[in-house]
Structures are given as structure tokens and as C-alpha cells.
Amino acid sequence: MSFAKSCKNELSRIEINRECCERAELAAFIHMNGSLTIKGDVTLHLTTENPAIARRIFRVFKSRFKKEMQILMRKKMRLQKGNSYSLILTGKNTVSLVLSNLEITKGSFDLNTGITPELVANRCCKRAYLRGAFMARGSIANPDASYHMEMTADYEEYLDDLIKVMQYFELSPGKLARKKEYVSYLKDSEQICEFLNIIGAHKTLLDYENVRVMKGMRNKINRLVNCETANLQKTVVASLRHIKNIQTIDENLGLTQLPKSLQEVAIKRVEYPEANLKELGELLEPPVGKSGVNHRLRKLEKIAEQLHQTGYYDENNGYLQ
């Protein structure tokens, strides 16, 4: 089951205890999902692929208007999964009464392209309206893949009003036009979690948080591993350079010609090529800090550079002091 479907299934089980919230949720769903056809009579169509949502809208509609909508199930083509569910209400007067009661139309089927403030006057109604809108035309990506939640609308004015409802709860949705639709979206994981809390999807919220925490831990571990790998690569590259310098000195001058402090660090460097500067310093007698080890290795590098350039070593340059 997809993350979005699981979320909508949870929303469809939420009990509505107030008539104003029942009205707000139903108004949002019908406004965003409904379509009208006029063939002899007027028919209101609602469509969803989620049977739980179909049952909920049927139940809420019956509770609100004491009427039953007709439910039709349509099987999809062979290559497509699942079924499509249509909720149908027929009759010009009945449809007109429902749409005007829900503030979706004004007058005789004159569509209200925004959200009537009365529908979302209360905080609880704002929550219910967002819940209905999400069930109608909302989607949420699995957080394992990406952080993304969106709702689409046919009218920009309507989407702007929907965004204002979201902003009431201190959400900061983005907005874009996609083909013939307008889209409101959230990409910040914390804001998506807050949206789920607002619409009452608390189980989905916990699941989302769990995935988010695990994803964060994996990313942190990966960063640490990458950092360790990078540090190891730097250590290896530096170690190879040190060993090459030591070989140059040994072949052209002889390590025995070096002061004891430089001899010791040269021998330990060759014996422990994988050791970093801190570890190398701890192998010396007495132990030496990172800066001390680095200073000695730089002296060896300068000696090797002179031997490489001139073929001999001038003791007067002070590198052996």
C-alpha cells in the first residue's frame, strides 16, 4: 500500500463530532473533486480510487443531507490496478440545494471559485477543510524517497484561498502551475509533519517521523563514513609521499646519516604506512604530538627534494640540525 493511500485510509476513519466540521470537510471534497453533467437532468459526480474515501463521503453526505448518493464501481483496464468509485447525485433541485448549502455555488449553479470564509470560520473547520481537500486531491510521497506533499486545484483563486488556510497554521506552502492545474506543495519535512497533525493523520505522522529519523541517521552515518574514507585517502596519499621521500634519502644518503629523531620517524613511517600523524607520534619514544611529527616529516621532505634536485646533500643547509 502506498504511503498516500495509507494516510487517506486513516483520514477516512476519523470521527466528525461537529456539524460545522462535517460541512467543511464535505464542501472541500466536493469543491475539489466534483463535476457536473447536464443531460436532461443535472448530475453531480464524485470520483475516487480509494474505497475507504468513497464510503466516508457517502456516510458524511447521508448524515448531512439525509440523502444517499449512488455508488458505482468501475474496474480498470487489465494493465491498471485497482478500481474506480463514482458517487452520483441526480436531480437539478437536489444538486442545487447541496451545492448552495456547501457554499460551492451561488445562485443557479454559478460556481464560487474561492473558499467562502464562513466555511472555515472556526479553527476546527479549517482542519476539517484541509482534510477534505487532501482526501480529494492531495498526495504525499513516501519519505524514504523524498519529502513532498501537494494538493491540486482547477482554479488559482481557490488554491490561493486554500494556501491562506494553510498559512493560518503557520505553514509555508509553495505554489506552481502545472498544465491546467494549480499546485500547493510542502517540501520541508517538519512542515509536512505539522500538516499531517493538523488534518488528524496521527498514525501516519508517527510513521513519517520514524522514517524521517531513520533516514537522518542513515545520512549521518553515510556522512561519517564518507568523511572517514576521505581522511583515510588523505592519510594514504600523504603516507606514500613520505615513504617516497624516505626511500630517496635512504638510496642517496642513507638513513644512518640522519639525526636520531628523523631516523626514528622515518623507520616508523615505513613500518606503519596506514597510521595517521597522531598514531605515528604515539609510536615514537618518547611520544610526539601531531605538530612535532609533521615538523619532522617536512624536514625529511626538504632533504629528499634537495637530493632529488642536486644528487647530493649539503649539510650546511641546516636540515639536519
Swiss-Prot record:
GO MF term list: DNA binding
DNA-binding region: 276-309
PANTHER family named among the record's database cross-references: CELL DIVISION PROTEIN WHIA-RELATED (PTHR37307:SF1)
SUPFAM superfamilies on file: Homing endonucleases (SSF55608)
Signal keyword on record: no
BP term (GO), one: cell division
Species for this entry: Natranaerobius thermophilus (strain ATCC BAA-1301 / DSM 18059 / JW/NM-WN-LF)
Name listed for the protein in its UniProt record: Probable cell division protein WhiA
UniProt entry keywords in alphabetical sequence: Cell cycle, Cell division, DNA-binding
Gene giving rise to this polypeptide: whiA
Lineage: Bacteria, Bacillati, Bacillota, Clostridia, Natranaerobiales
Signal peptide limits: none
Family to which the UniProt record says this protein belongs: Belongs to the WhiA family.
Functional note: Involved in cell division and chromosome segregation.
